[in-house]
Amino acid sequence: MTTRLWAAILAASAFACVGVSSADTLLYKNVNGYTLNGDRELIRFSAIKIEDDRVAQLYSEGDSLPDEASIDSVRDGGGKTLTTGLIDAHGHVLSYGQSLLRVDLVGTTTEAGAAERVRAFAADNAELEWVLGRGWNQVLWDSNEFPTARSLDAVVADKPVWLSRVDGHAGWANSLAMEIAGITRDTADPDGGQILRDANGNPTGVFVDNAMALIRNNIPPATIEEQKFALMTAMNSLATYGLTSVHDAGVGSSTVAAYKELLEDGPLPIRVNVMLAATDQFYTERLAEGHFRDADDTLTINSVKIAADGALGSRGAAMIDDYSDMAGHRGLILHSEERMHYFMRAAMNAGFQVNTHAIGDAANKLVLDSYELLIAETGSSDRRHRVEHAQILRYEDIVRFAELGVIPSMQATHATSDKNMAVDRIGDVRIQGAYAWRKLMDAGALIANGSDFPVESPNPFFGLHASITRQDKDNDPVGGWYPEERMTDEEAFASFTLDAAYSGFQEDLLGSLEPGKKADFILLDRDIFAIPDTEIWQAKALETWVNGVRVHGD
């Protein structure tokens, strides 16, 4: 283990213990409080009383507060804004934790710049067997071209290098990594995957979707202890953004074991709602174990994650017609219909919610068709099945979400990140059904919002800002990108609270600060309902509380 990693371990361990407090009763007074109620109305309060891990009472301005002598802990909010804790309905906790411990390529503007970061990281961590990283995005580079192994070979030739694209649907390898994996020009593309090649048919070093396994299967798997540390690193970081709960998409058996071992030392710092990975080799065994819920409701397992296609940026999203910028190419369906139905049917028959990744219009149609067939077959209409991303839809499929009782689990910052290339990929007509939040809501669908971290920043205020403005943090473009799809402030807030909770079967516990619900709340540095919408992304969580316990802040 590297010196840098040991330092990170010590720092994270210290962070996890600092600023945590609990009390049997807590009165937080002098706050500018906001929560939604059961009628989805935004209500105000000036003080909140917590008993154990639950909200006991909200107090409006002028209400008599309880005798402070009867309260174990009294805190004065100094008039700052206190709101319901925010929920990210789609992220990847282990990947996020690992990304904090690997070379970070987010923000690079050239292939050479990315390679330089790899060189510096490898030099600082000389004892590593593999150099791993993530975050590159060729769409944002000057060349707008996929990278090649050559640039990595020039900076690290003596160790294998593997770098995941920002969306996790492509990877970039150096020549040694390909040699270890036995990749040659004769290596065939696997089903649902693509090896990018040069004009002579030689692999360039980029592997898309199912082809990534050709390299990744040669990387030594993380041990349970390494996974536990990465999970704790991630959860502690997520708490600093004001996230009190996340839905962890595509979790394998070893990571489930790591979560459960962490519970032996007490509740997790934030809530995690696990989606089991359908491709896990022990998938049927995990389903046979049934649902899981710890005593403190910090770990819940009642859903599965399936991937139907790839991502738009790497042209892996499955489209009905050709990509507008690549004639003859329609993306990748990752599983046969028979295999996908096997995954879905097994989960539905076991009483699990099915959450299927679908980005392209062909993938979304396939998933909705499959849900329509299998929901009727299994009688699982009450399981609130979801489509993760639901990014590009035919108009006729938009109405099917509400009709089938299917939840679109969407990530607002995907729209503001993809706006630079989405029209190039799919053209002016299909874009009308892309990132179509307003059309879906008007058709009766409920949207669970999230970020897809580490693909995007986990900062939920970035997501709230994007939902309301359809702009990036530079407030570009003026007026918003396809602004007719914007959410209202209350709708956006609900998508990160009530509706995200509903999408995980936790609306009776989470999503608002109504009496009887869990005491998950955050104290903010500004009033997100009073400042200009263009400034919402700047908001910061000063404190984060889960189960009435402070997990972030002083």
Q: In which residue ranges do the predicted regions lie?
A:
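Gram-negative bacterial Sec-dependent N-terminal signal peptides
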Residues: 2-20
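Divalent metal-binding segments
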Residues: 25-29, 34-36, 40-287, 302, ...
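Flexible, active-site-proximal loop/turn residues at the rims of small-molecule/cofactor binding pockets
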Residues: 137, 252, 414, 528, ...
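Acidic (Asp/Glu)-rich catalytic clusters
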Residues: 263-265, 290-299, 380, 401-403
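Short proline/glycine-enriched turn/loop segments at secondary-structure junctions
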Residues: 292-293, 532-536
